[in-house]
Design a protein with these regions (language model features):
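Transmembrane helical elements of multi-pass membrane transporters/channels
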Residues: 1-53, 117, 121-125
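Residue-level recognition of pore/gate-forming positions within transmembrane alpha-helices
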Residues: 8, 35-38, 85, 118, ...
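Helix-loop interface residues and adjacent transmembrane-helix termini in multi-pass membrane transporters
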Residues: 21-24, 133-134, 161
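Interfacial segments at transmembrane-helix termini and the short loops linking adjacent helices
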Residues: 24-25, 64, 89-119
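Helix-loop junctions and terminal segments of transmembrane helices
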Residues: 37-63, 67, 130-133
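Interfacial transmembrane-helix starts/ends
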Residues: 63-79, 83-91, 108-111
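Membrane-interface junctions at transmembrane-helix termini in multi-pass inner-membrane proteins
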Residues: 115-145, 186
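Membrane-interface helix-loop junctions in multi-pass transport and translocation proteins
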Residues: 135-138, 145-180, 187-188, 192
């Protein structure tokens, strides 16, 4: 529950900081971009909920099968994220103009950057079955807190310089740190880092 609340709060940090530091207009433009990129965030939860039982069952059958199924999940999730992020990057301007109009054209470069948070958000959600099976649900909260801390610090630096684009860079970087790089720090989750890396590269 606490982790869920932390995620909900974190996803609003950018808009709050933009509004306070730059103004409501910048926050509104940023919001238009994030509404497009975040509309996809339900996908990994649906997939993970459907495959979790088979992954948890594989743990009892052997480590090889267990990690093989986890790798397949990461590969699927990363593939879907790339399939969303790449077209959105190149079509960001027509998407913004179609959905919000010319007055929101400045949201286009923000969307082209922010959409890449999708990849690491997806990978973070895909780690869920492993957290449950290994009895390490506390890692989820820790990773969320790392993500939020990095995001706030970078926002303080980048928003005054680049407004919404700075906030988008902060968001993507914070997800990279919290959902991906943080796994290499912990001995228990280091193997997950390498599974995620293989799915990306």
């Amino acid at each position: 529950i606490v982790s869920g609340l932390a995620v909900g709060l974190f996803m609003k940090i950018d808009q709050v900081m933009l509004r306070e530091m730059v103004g409501s207009e910048s926050a509104g433009i940023y919001s238009a971009a994030t509404r497009i990129s975040e509309v996809w965030y339900f996908i990994p939860a649906v997939i993970v909920s459907s495959v979790s039982p088979s992954i948890i069952a594989a743990k009892k059958m052997g480590e090889g099968l267990y990690y093989q199924r986890l790798q397949r999940l990461f590969n699927l999730i990363a593939g879907l994220a790339f399939a969303i992020a790449i077209p959105t990057t190149f079509l960001s301007r027509p998407l913004i103009l179609l959905l919000f109009g010319e007055s929101y054209a400045a949201a286009s470069p923000i969307l082209a950057i922010h959409i890449w948070a999708t990849l690491f958000y997806f990978l973070g959600i895909a780690q869920g079955p492993w957290n449950i099976t290994e009895g390490l649900m506390n890692l989820s909260l820790k990773r969320t807190l790392i993500t939020a801390m990095v995001n706030i610090i970078l926002n303080l630096i980048l928003i005054p310089l680049y407004a919404g684009i700075g906030a988008a860079i902060s968001t993507v970087t914070s997800y990279v740190c919290g959902a991906f790089l943080a796994n290499i720090i912990n001995d228990k989750s280091r193997r997950i880092f390498f599974l995620q890396a293989e799915s990306i590269f």
